[in-house]
From Swiss-Prot:
<dbReference type="GO" id="GO:0005634">
    <property type="term" value="C:nucleus"/>
</dbReference>
<feature type="cross-link" description="Glycyl lysine isopeptide (Lys-Gly) (interchain with G-Cter in ubiquitin)">
    <location>
        <position position="58"/>
    </location>
</feature>
<comment type="subunit">
    <text>Interacts with the phytoene synthase PSY1 in chloroplast. Binds to the eukaryotic release factor eRF1-2. Interacts with the transcription factor TCP14 in the nucleus to repress chloroplast biogenesis in etiolated seedlings. Associates to the E2 ubiquitin-conjugating enzyme UBC19.</text>
</comment>
<feature type="transit peptide" description="Chloroplast">
    <location>
        <begin position="1"/>
        <end position="55"/>
    </location>
</feature>
<dbReference type="GO" id="GO:0009416">
    <property type="term" value="P:response to light stimulus"/>
</dbReference>
<dbReference type="GO" id="GO:0005737">
    <property type="term" value="C:cytoplasm"/>
</dbReference>
<dbReference type="GO" id="GO:0009704">
    <property type="term" value="P:de-etiolation"/>
</dbReference>
<feature type="repeat" description="CXXCXGXG motif">
    <location>
        <begin position="230"/>
        <end position="237"/>
    </location>
</feature>
<keyword id="KW-0963">Cytoplasm</keyword>
<keyword id="KW-0812">Transmembrane</keyword>
<dbReference type="GO" id="GO:0009507">
    <property type="term" value="C:chloroplast"/>
</dbReference>
<comment type="function">
    <text>Involved in chromoplast differentiation. Associated with a cellular process that triggers the differentiation of pro-plastids or other non-colored plastids into chromoplasts for carotenoid accumulation. Is associated with carotenoid accumulation in chromoplasts. Functions as a major regulator of the phytoene synthase PSY1 protein level and activity. Modulates carotenoid biosynthesis by means of post-transcriptional regulation of PSY1. Modulates carotenoid biosynthesis in part by up-regulating a series of endogenous carotenogenic genes.</text>
</comment>
<keyword id="KW-0472">Membrane</keyword>
<keyword id="KW-0150">Chloroplast</keyword>
<keyword id="KW-0832">Ubl conjugation</keyword>
<dbReference type="GO" id="GO:0031969">
    <property type="term" value="C:chloroplast membrane"/>
</dbReference>
<keyword id="KW-0539">Nucleus</keyword>
Amino acid sequence: MSSLGRILSVSYPPDPYTWRFSQYKLSSSLGRNRRLRWRFTALDPESSSLDSESSADKFASGFCIIEGPETVQDFAKMQLQEIQDNIRSRRNKIFLHMEEVRRLRIQQRIKNTELGIINEEQEHELPNFPSFIPFLPPLTAANLKVYYATCFSLIAGIILFGGLLAPTLELKLGIGGTSYADFIQSLHLPMQLSQVDPIVASFSGGAVGVISALMVVEVNNVKQQEHKRCKYCLGTGYLACARCSSTGALVLTEPVSAIAGGNHSLSPPKTERCSNCSGAGKVMCPTCLCTGMAMASEHDPRIDPFD
């Protein structure tokens, strides 16, 4: 009984009024905290989802599956939620980068217009293919005729060298040592075999075949790239703005009031920047989403990330 009395004396405060006041103060503070908590959750109902998405984005941004053409990490052991978070994060980054490129190009066009710089080559930012012929520019659809003329000139030159120039140098000038006719005569073979030099013929035929094959490959590459381009914007990624007729400015029309007996000159028309294209004169192509490709998708089998 004495120990029970000690426990009761220790458990309860000696003053009942102080105990009631402290209990009321504690309950009021807990109620206030609950009301504040409910208020914050009502103001921001998506706080939990945002926190989860931000944590998922942080995890996805720090994880790199493909660091280069030779280093690809194994992601087969990832959980399903991790895979979904990484897909969502990377898709969002793709569209954000595309929007940044679109705005940067619009701003670049505005700056070029203000400075009076007109460069049409920047409008066609398509990949160029290096030529197999030295000292020639990269192969595009514009200079394809130049490549045709160059290849035909090389083939004609090789044929003329093997058919006319080489026999003349060999027979009349004695360049090249023993002629092929003397070699055939020394072996007591029919002289009809000496009418064609196999060395010159093989050199000429091989050169013509190699140049023709390479030219066919280059032409096929150009045609394939043309098929990959968007059919609406022709690979530029942008279309002409229909509101300002690709000028970037709108003419403000004001009503003109005629005053009897008055000769007043009309005020010059006022212009303002087009709000549809932001003064660039071009808008985003809705088909390719500024990529210039015929199909913009991660499922496109024609897109090689290591090309």
